[in-house]
Amino acid sequence: MPHAALAGARGSLWWTDCLDLLARVPDGAARLVVADPPYAVAKAEWDEFDSLDAYVDWCDRWLAEVHRALAPDGTAYVCGFSEILAEVKARSGRRFAGGVRWLVWSYRNKANLGGDWGRSHESILHLRKARRFVMNVDAVRIPYNDHTRRYPERVQAVSSQYGGGVRRDRWEPHPLGAKPRDVLDIPTLCNGMTEKTDHPTQKPEELVRRLVLASSDADDLVVDPFCGSGTTLVVADRLGRRWLGGDADPAYVGMARRRLLATM
C-alpha cells in the first residue's frame, strides 16, 4: 500500500514501488522521467534478480508505464551499466517512436581497486516518445575546447554545416558555449562532498541538473520512480519544476524527505 511521505508546493514523495508510483501519473502528464533503477549487479538486496531476462522483463513493464505517462513531446532518461542497458534498449527501445540516444556519464575521480580495467563511466538511455521532443540546447551548452578559445573567429568553409544553411564569411563561437555532447564529464560523488548521502548509487546533482534543464521547462512535471536519496526531486524543485517521486525502500524515502525539507 503506497504511503505519502511528503507533500510540498511543487510535488509529493511516496514510499511505494515504481509501478504504483507511475500509475499515479495521468496519461501524457509528465514531460520528463528520470529513472535510476537497480542495475541487476547484486549491489544490495534490492538489486538482485533471478536472471538478466527477468530484469529486462521487469524493466519492460515499468517502461511501458513510462511511455504512457509521458507527454507527446516528453522523454525519459534511464541510467545503468552499458552491458545491462544494451539488453533493455533492445527490448524496450522500440516502444519509443522518437528513438533512443545513448549518453555516457564519464568520471575520472574513482579509484581502480581491482585487477581489471577500472570502470570510469555509466550509460544513460535517452528515450524519446516522438520525433519532436523538448531539447533545450542553450540551457546545457558547455565550454569550448582550448583551440576554439584560442582562435575564436575563423573563416567558414562553403561546405560548413555550422551556419545552419546560412553562408557567413566568418564563424564566431556562441556566447553561451558549445552545443552539448553525448559524453558528460562530471565527477562521481565521494566521501566528504557536501551532497553525499549513504545511498550506494547516488547521482551527482550536476548530472541530473543537466538532464532536467535539457528536457523540461519551468512548471513541467518531472517524475522519478526510483528516487533513492531524492536527487532528481531536489534538483527539480530548485529549477521550478513540479515533481513526483517514490522509492520502495523506506530508508531511502527518509533520506529524500530530509533533503527535500532542506530545499523546499
Where are these regions (language model features)?
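Core catalytic lobe of class I
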Residues: 1-255
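Active-site catalytic microenvironments for nucleophilic, acid-base chemistry
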Residues: 214, 259-262
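Conserved phosphoryl-transfer catalytic core
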Residues: 252, 261-264
